[in-house]
Amino acid sequence: MMSSITKKPIKNYLECGCNIGRNIDQLKLAMPSLVPSIIEISKPAFDYVTSHHNFEHAFNGAILDSKLPNSHFDLVFTMGVLIHINPEQLIDHLRHMFDYSNKYVLIGEYFNRTPISIEYQGQKDRLFKRDFGKLFIENFPVE
């Protein structure tokens, strides 16, 4: 991915589900000139991360409720978030990510060749593994 970024550099990014901002901390160290934006559903995590970082856009709520500018972000990414989205709503979440991006979408999630639901913290239907990349490519026009 980094070799692609040198061909089409990025100036800003949106993290969907940033929690307390660990990825933001690392991106700030690696690429300090990037302008960050976030979507975070947890109010305590949102309050924490917004007290430690400045954002172009910061939305506290679900991605499906967000109204950020389309085609605005050079990179839209999520890490360990989509695995918790009910499969019936997954395409809608991916569509928001696709719509917000103007260059790159990065999905870092648990992988399984076939969709599977796994018990998570003693609860059923809270963690879903699948091939998220394949699902994205099959549903959105990507290069």
Regions found by a protein language model. Give the residues of each.
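A conserved beta-strand element that flanks and buttresses the S-adenosyl-L-methionine
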Residues: 77
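Nucleotide-sugar donor-binding/catalytic module of glycosyltransferases
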Residues: 80
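A short His-aromatic
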Residues: 83-85
